[in-house]
């Protein structure tokens, strides 16, 4: 099975979501080495954080390739990545930090998303309307 991950937190966050994301990838690749793990991140981030991912033949990092995608990495993560995943014949996408790219379902790519915080549901008054609409 070819499993793709949103790896931005792996390469950009030293604690919290970064630790969780690295733990998931390292644990899965150690326990199920027969699968392929593709880590998609908008930039190389911090080398020290990338090195916390165990070197295994089944794990690889992937970055935006096109000029437009490199100029607008946030847009690539939300919409451009879907075309890449389709071309790569990914079997499953895992959004490790509360979000997944648009149009995965329409492109036949099953997805899992980890939700870390639901406080916006309990205390919506603490959030701006735009943030509430994004989170829900």
Residue ranges and their predicted role:
Residues 1-136:
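Carbohydrate transferase catalytic cores enriched for Leloir-type hexosyltransferases
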């Amino acid at each position: 099975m070819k499993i793709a991950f949103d790896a931005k937190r792996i390469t950009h966050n030293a604690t919290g979501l970064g630790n969780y994301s690295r733990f998931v990838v390292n644990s899965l690749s150690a326990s199920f080495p027969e699968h392929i793990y593709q880590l998609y991140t908008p930039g190389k981030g911090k080398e020290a954080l990338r090195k916390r991912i165990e070197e295994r033949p089944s794990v690889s990092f992937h970055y935006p390739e096109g000029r437009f995608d490199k100029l607008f990495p946030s847009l690539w993560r939300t919409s451009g990545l879907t075309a890449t995943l389709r071309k790569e014949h990914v079997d499953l996408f895992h959004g490790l930090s509360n979000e997944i790219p648009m149009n995965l379902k329409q492109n036949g790519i099953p997805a899992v998303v980890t939700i870390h915080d639901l406080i916006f549901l309990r205390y919506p008054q603490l959030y701006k309307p735009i943030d509430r609409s994004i989170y829900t």
